[in-house]
Curated annotation (Swiss-Prot):
The lineage of its organism: Eukaryota, Viridiplantae, Streptophyta, Embryophyta, Tracheophyta. This is Protein EXORDIUM-like 5. It comes from Arabidopsis thaliana (Mouse-ear cress). Pfam families: Phi_1. It is found in: Secreted; Secreted, Extracellular space; Secreted, Extracellular space, Apoplast. May play a role in a brassinosteroid-dependent regulation of growth and development. InterPro entries: EXORDIUM-like. Belongs to the EXORDIUM family. Residues 1-25 form the signal peptide. Induction: By brassinolide. GO terms for cellular component: apoplast. The keyword Glycoprotein applies. Glycans are attached at N144. Keywords: Apoplast, Glycoprotein, Secreted, Signal.
Length: 363
């Protein structure tokens, strides 16, 4: 999402007449590479049978046979390199700041996603395979974004040291306080802060215009320059905006199949995971807002996550999330993570294909 302010793209511009549900068994599907078993996923037998699902397929005249046009493939997208750094040193150190009240299960879910980025053992399609697209981006020396990501430190600010309403400036004060209290190192070369606010914390423009954003710290406020990202937990404030498709806006009514079931049963946090993925991909490829982005205005760049917002699988785009998977419990996902976790994470722009791509592509 664009930095410093992430513009929310409402990716559900479609009529309810085209809002229909298709499920196809993998036994009859030619794309058997997505078949998962109990042993490979380490999940209960009740969730062993996986099906492919696309709850918002395009009209039949624009079917999956022409899916490339729904995956953002375009020679008109001018994503350019502006000579700035990318996070290429290994590992990329993430310093997580938990602001507000966070439960252990919610923290565990987000940690598992972050740890899945470097976990090559997860079955395909996996989070680590998704991150390979981010690692295609290079700096002027030819160094790629690192494939290794590490949670290098954590700090819990459960007492809301800067109140329960934050702005883009006070978020830097939160970072400064956390850096001092947790004794985070000044990690210029390969570090970043990830500020996560709980469901009862409001942020300037949250729900109205942003679900998350990234920028860099100001020396005058934090003491040095370092990239950071902020993402809010929308579960009680605006799940229909920031946790879509696990929650639907009211104007959609009841003409379609309804919201999708989140892979870990947590609408707000499962939705948050995709926003975190979006922001991380943009931080590493454009940490100081002078590396990879489209458009001429660095104060409102279109970045590698923005170009694919709302796209989760093949056949998607133009208002459709694409073909994703569903287990027997009805939970939807498009990639596997560490320890049998499953996630639904948006695709990102592939500079080689000049299209959005993800590990669950069936083309």
């Amino acid at each position: 999402m664009s930095s410093p302010a992430t513009t929310i793209t409402f990716f559900f511009f479609f009529t309810l007449s085209s809002f229909f549900y298709i499920t196809s068994s993998l036994q009859n599907n030619n794309n058997n590479k997505h078949t998962a078993t109990v042993n490979s996923l380490n999940i209960p037998s009740a969730a062993a049978e996986i099906t492919l699902v696309n709850p918002k397929l395009p009209p039949r005249s624009l079917s999956l046979t022409s899916s490339k046009k729904f995956e953002g493939s375009s020679n008109l997208v001018h994503l350019r390199y502006h000579m700035g750094p990318v996070l290429s040193s290994s590992p990329i150190n993430i310093y997580v700041i938990w602001y507000g009240q966070w439960s252990r299960p919610h923290k565990s879910l987000i940690r598992d996603f972050l740890n899945s980025i470097s976990d090559a053992k997860a079955p395909s399609p996996s989070v680590s395979e998704w991150w390979r697209t981010a690692s295609l981006y290079t700096d002027q020396t030819g160094s790629n974004v690192s494939r290794s990501v590490l949670i290098a430190g954590e700090y819990s600010d459960s007492k809301y040291s800067h109140g329960q309403h934050l702005t883009r400036l006070t978020i830097q004060e939160v970072i400064a306080s956390a850096a001092r209290s947790a004794s985070f190192p000044v990690d210029h070369k390969n570090g970043m802060y990830l500020v996560l606010t709980s469901h009862d914390v409001t942020m300037q423009d949250f729900c109205r215009a942003v679900c998350g954003f990234h920028y860099f710290t100001f020396p005058s406020m934090v003491g040095y320059t370092m990239p950071y990202a902020w993402v809010g937990q929308s579960g009680k404030q605006c799940p229909e905006v920031c946790a879509y498709p696990f929650a639907l806006p009211g104007y959609m009514g009841h003409g379609g199949p309804g919201e999708l079931r989140p892979p870990n049963g947590e609408t707000g946090v499962d939705g948050m995971v995709s926003v975190i993925g979006h922001e991380l991909a943009e931080v590493v490829s454009n940490p100081l807002i002078n590396a990879w982005y489209a458009g001429e205005d660095p104060t409102a760049p279109t970045e590698i996550g923005d170009l694919c917002e709302g796209l989760y699988g093949s056949g998607g785009g133009g208002g459709y999330i694409g073909q994703v998977m569903r287990d027997r419990e009805g939970k939807t996902f498009n990639m596997n993570g560490k320890g049998g976790r499953k996630f639904l994470v948006q695709w990102i722009w592939n500079p080689n294909l000049k299209a959005c791509s993800g590990p669950n592509s069936v083309d």
